[in-house]
């Protein structure tokens, strides 16, 4: 989250300086010479697990970095999601009880009943 905040703040700051001109960069396409003190940071995007998406709404402009593995997993789970109308449920039916059968049973294993004992000065709760 800290990286995203720093990256967002940097991009917003750079965007606000739109009237400034870029410094001339010497070199060809394969090698670029940039002053070391002007570098803010470097993020290697060569891996397949990082994707960059541009974000633009009424208040924010910037780049969003996401983990592609998690995005693909979420998309596959949402494709398998069944909505209310498609859910597999048992059909409606009347409840039937045998003689002496309770309406529901408690699932938890409760401790057997016993008297409470308190030490001197011990609170009730």
UniProtKB/Swiss-Prot annotation:
Keywords: Glycoprotein, Pheromone, Signal. Disulfide bonds: none annotated. Transmembrane segments: none annotated. Residues 1-22 form the signal peptide. GO terms for molecular function: mating pheromone activity. One of its GO terms (biological process) is mating. Glycans are attached at residues 57, 67. It comes from the Eukaryota. GO terms for cellular component: extracellular region. InterPro entries: Mating_factor_a, Mating_factor_alpha_C, Mating_factor_alpha_N. This is Mating factor alpha.
């Amino acid at each position: 989250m800290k990286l995203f905040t720093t990256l967002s703040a940097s991009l917003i700051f750079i965007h606000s300086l739109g009237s400034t001109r870029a410094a001339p960069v010497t070199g060809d396409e394969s090698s670029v010479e940039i002053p070391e003190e002007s570098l803010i940071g470097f993020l290697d995007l060569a891996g397949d697990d990082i994707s960059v998406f541009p974000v633009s709404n009424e208040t924010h402009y910037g780049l969003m970095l996401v983990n592609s593995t998690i995005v693909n997993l979420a998309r596959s789970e949402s494709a398998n999601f069944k909505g209310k109308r498609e859910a597999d449920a048992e059909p409606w039916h009347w409840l039937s009880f045998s003689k002496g059968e309770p309406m529901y049973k408690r699932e938890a294993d409760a401790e057997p009943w016993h008297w409470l004992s308190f030490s001197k000065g011990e609170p009730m709760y």
